[in-house]
Amino acid sequence: EIGCSPEFLSWLTDPVLNGGGALTDFGCYGANIATWMLEGETPLHVSCIAKQSKPKLYPKVDDDTTIVLEYEKIQVVIHASWNWSHNRKDMQIYGSQGYINCINHNQMELMTTEKEGVKTHQPAPISDYQKDPFRLLYEVVHENRIIEPNGLYSVENNLIVSKILTLATLAAEKNEPLAKHHYFS
């Protein structure tokens, strides 16, 4: 149903094998991008509702999750679901000066004033190493590529992402928001 090989799906849907359901499968992307955009800032509170909409198909893990990250000045909402009718990889960013709607990897809408309305934007293509994690690993090992701290691929960023997802899992289990001091030092 979600387009994975049987081998990957069996891992993805088994918490003992470290598959974590939709929470970790899709939640990691939102946490990663938020951490990158906020330059490594950690959330003050993490809330999470993780549920099973299709328990017969995914009996051991969640398949529909909402994670809310509360920061000092903003809030990030991550919808991680295997239950949408079609493939979605979109993002909306709302700010005091307008919004950005990232429809997909190459189509964006921007609005800064209602009078001028929505403008379309095509972002620059990403580099080859950003498309291919094995290429990136090769460049780090053999070509001394430096990964910027808090960049999307950095250890710093991904440690924060792991902590966010751990807190989200615990928040869902306890059915209550968890404060930063539960996991971030």
Tell me what each language-model feature is.
Residues 37-41, 96-100, 140, 168-172:
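Phosphate/oxyanion-binding loops and surfaces in catalytic or ligand/nucleic-acid-binding neighborhoods
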Residues 30-33, 133-137:
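Hydrophobic alpha-helical segments typical of transmembrane helices
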Residues 50-51, 55-65, 71-136, 151:
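NAD(P)-dinucleotide binding in Rossmann-like oxidoreductases
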Residues 26-29, 129-132, 156-160:
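A generic structural signal for residues located within well-ordered alpha-helices
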Residues 20-22, 122-124, 147-155:
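Active-site rim elements
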Residues 136-185:
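C-terminal helix-rich "cap/oligomerization" subdomain common to oxidoreductases
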Residues 1-58, 175:
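Predominantly a Rossmann-like dinucleotide-binding segment in NAD(P)-dependent oxidoreductases
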Residues 41-42, 117, 145-147:
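Short, solvent-exposed loop/turn segments that connect beta-strands within catalytic domains
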